Amino acid sequence: MKQSLVAIFCLIAISLSAQSWDIFTPVNGALHNYGGTSTAAGEYVVGLLREDDDFLKGHIVFIDKEGNYKLKTFLNDKYNTMLCGAIGFENGNALVVGGMNWAGEGKERSILLVMVVNPDLDVITEHRYEIDESLDHISSTAYLEYDENGDIILALQCGIMNNSVFEGVPYMCKLDTEGNLLKTKCIDEDLGISGRDITGMTMVPNSNQILLFASGLFYGANLGACYLDEDFNVLNKYLTHRGIFRYYSNFWIDNEHFIASTIETEDVGPYNIYDVTLYEVDKEFNYYNTLVLHRADTSTVTAQITSIVPINENYMYVAGFKPVFNSNVISDIVVWIVDKNLNVHGAKTLARDNSYNYLLGCQGTTEEGGVILYGHSKLLDNTEMMSIWKLIPEDFGLSLSVNEVAQDNSKTAVYPNPTNEVINIPVRDLKGNYSISIWDMSGIKYFDMSVDKEGEELSVDVSSL
């Protein structure tokens, strides 16, 4: 990294704008499930587009380091083409995976599509694998990581129709860097319950073990995790946390502890509240530090952490989206800089006015120590677009910290970029003590207060401080 991370702590940045590019605006189309990867040449973003009365089309966008982009569409006759993941090579090329799902007459069949592409989006090699003739669908969810031998581990979400009900079927694959399929295994029976969705994967440091997260383990829709060996045999299974229905991890503190993001439910009166939380977790799923990045209200728009991108061994970008307070149609994309002890050192909101913005993913870091994000915006007139942002540490501004102490549990919620606005903080029905502070990236507090309230909201007019 050319730029020292000292800049994160010594610069007060309140209203700097990030670089951004709108890629395309399909008036009658909907963008879905983009994944991507960083390479030496730039960023690959892959996904799919649904247009009215048309097949699903796979898309690859390549963005170079200056923000210039190329777009290529992949459509295979009578197949819905769903590109869902990519992993980069040192030479600037990338391996892209996706599903080709039959949309014509006759028996349905699903094919795993594997391509190696270059920055000009030329297809260097292409492979098509029918990994299981019983599959009805290869979904738009895939996680790719390198193992210790340099091969590529692919966790792929597939599915079958069972009595008109779609059931998720998790598959594990191993590929070489030319896209040859070396090994594949359905791990559904090993896990014991069908109908799961894969929600995350990470390689365990200094081993060829795989840590896989999936819903549906043990008890219906609750979330679980399992360790797999290099032959995709299940070693250990864990029920990670009741009430959590998303899980993602990509930051190992050491060989035994990692940072994971979750969305978890909490019953508050007649509502289910969805909190976005970071945890420090060990390999046996004991929980340590906790950081609530978004304290949800009763909105029907669910907040979510989409990506954790390591900056170095001590710091990470944590990116996701959250609803605007008390709204079920408007949401913002948010990026935080967080250290391994779960302290927040900066935050940035990316939003279009009066639109539903959600983050599809992010990659990094750039030569300046920054991060590339790609998101989807749906305007109130139903126009949809994909946008790409480039952030560097100087783009990050003030943050509002709310520390809640209730029923012997202490959690810290962070509200980014509160300058010149009133922050409304929902207070739970449970009585709690709150301390509120605002600081800059050098750690200087501007404001501090303690509150003891019950069953209402706190309002802080940041512009008057």
Regions found by a protein language model. Give the residues of each.
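Compositionally biased non-globular segments, especially hydrophobic aliphatic-rich helices
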Residues: 10, 16, 217-219, 422
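Residues in and immediately flanking transmembrane alpha helices
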Residues: 15-16, 77, 430, 453
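C-terminal outer-membrane/trafficking sorting elements
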Residues: 406-415, 419-465
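Detector for intrinsically disordered, low-structure N-terminal pre-sequences
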Residues: 5, 11-13, 96, 203, ...
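A sequence-level/structural motif corresponding to short, flexible coil/turn segments enriched
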Residues: 19-403
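Bacterial Sec-dependent N-terminal signal peptides
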Residues: 1-21, 402, 417, 444
